[in-house]
């Protein structure tokens, strides 16, 4: 959808997933470092998350196809292509839906090779970047530039996810991927505000070089904000788990002390009875 809602929708999807990852991966990492950690709960969490991502993708496809001015699953009619921009967006969502399904199969079916889920996710991100690269030809300079900046996050994420096929559960790669997904989500919102200003705000001059310079700088700010979100959530998870661990130790020590006091009192009573 070539409007504000058409960019806010995928932006919200990517932002929600990124924020969830910024909490999930630190939790998983710190649980791995502890003994007797309930890892089977994280497998269930992976399945639920993959199902949600698949649902988001299907919702995106339906939104692109069945909006009032959408193609309604018609690709070609009377010697004309129909709403190819909507079809490109639908194709992007389709690959992410496949990625979500493969993620679920990885944890539900034992004979699916480990790492296929990351490979398919890398392919989905690459396809998104590939589609965006040819998405903005013959557009005004600002329109081309603001979309092309997104390619850095997409192809960087593709490389990072591809490395996860080999280095699975690597916390640094997972957090790097998380930061790029958050960046992608916030940048979709930024594209919507720049190209389709809501609330009657003035439109941007798409041929002004100063606007190109500002948007480039703004992209850097967006990534700094994404890194800050990942760092803050990582720290909060660490502090929370550390506090819970200390609280649990305190309860265990208290119980042990009560047991030792009961044992001591029992010994005294036994000694007095013998006398």
From Swiss-Prot:
Domain of life from the UniProt record: Eukaryota
One annotated GO biological process: innate immune response
TM helices/strands, residue ranges: 7-27, 47-67, 94-114, 116-136, 146-166, 180-200, 212-232
Residues annotated with Phosphoserine modification: 270, 272
Family: Belongs to the TMEM45 family.
Described function: Plays a role in innate immunity. Mechanistically, promotes alphaviruses RNA degradation by interacting with the viral polymerase nsP4 and the mRNA-capping enzyme nsP1 and thereby interfering with the interaction between viral RNA and nsP1.
The protein's name: Transmembrane protein 45B
Natural source organism: Homo sapiens (Human)
């Amino acid at each position: 959808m070539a409007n504000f809602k058409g960019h806010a929708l995928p932006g919200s999807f990517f932002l929600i997933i990124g924020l969830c990852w910024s909490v999930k991966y630190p939790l998983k990492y710190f649980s791995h470092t502890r003994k007797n950690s309930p890892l089977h709960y994280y497998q269930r969490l992976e399945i639920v998350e993959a199902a949600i991502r698949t649902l988001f993708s299907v919702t995106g496809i339906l939104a692109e196809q069945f909006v009032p001015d959408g193609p309604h699953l018609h690709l070609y009619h009377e010697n004309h292509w129909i709403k190819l921009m909507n079809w490109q967006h639908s194709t992007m969502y389709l690959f992410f839906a496949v990625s979500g399904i493969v993620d679920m199969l990885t944890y539900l079916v034992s004979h699916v090779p480990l790492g296929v889920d990351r490979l398919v996710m890398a392919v989905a991100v690459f396809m998104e970047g590939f589609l965006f690269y040819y998405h903005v030809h013959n557009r005004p300079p600002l329109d081309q530039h603001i979309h092309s900046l997104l390619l850095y996050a997409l192809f960087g994420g593709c490389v990072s996810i591809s490395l996860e096929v080999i280095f699975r559960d690597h916390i640094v790669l997972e957090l790097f991927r998380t930061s790029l997904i958050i960046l992608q989500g916030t940048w979709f919102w930024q594209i919507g505000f720049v190209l389709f200003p809501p609330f009657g705000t003035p439109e941007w001059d798409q041929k002004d070089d100063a606007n190109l310079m500002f948007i480039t700088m703004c992209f850097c700010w967006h990534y700094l904000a994404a890194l800050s979100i990942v760092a803050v959530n990582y720290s909060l998870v660490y502090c929370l788990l550390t506090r819970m661990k200390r609280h649990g130790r305190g309860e265990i020590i208290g119980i042990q002390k009560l047991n030792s006091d009961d044992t001591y009192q029992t010994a005294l009573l036994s000694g007095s009875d013998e006398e």
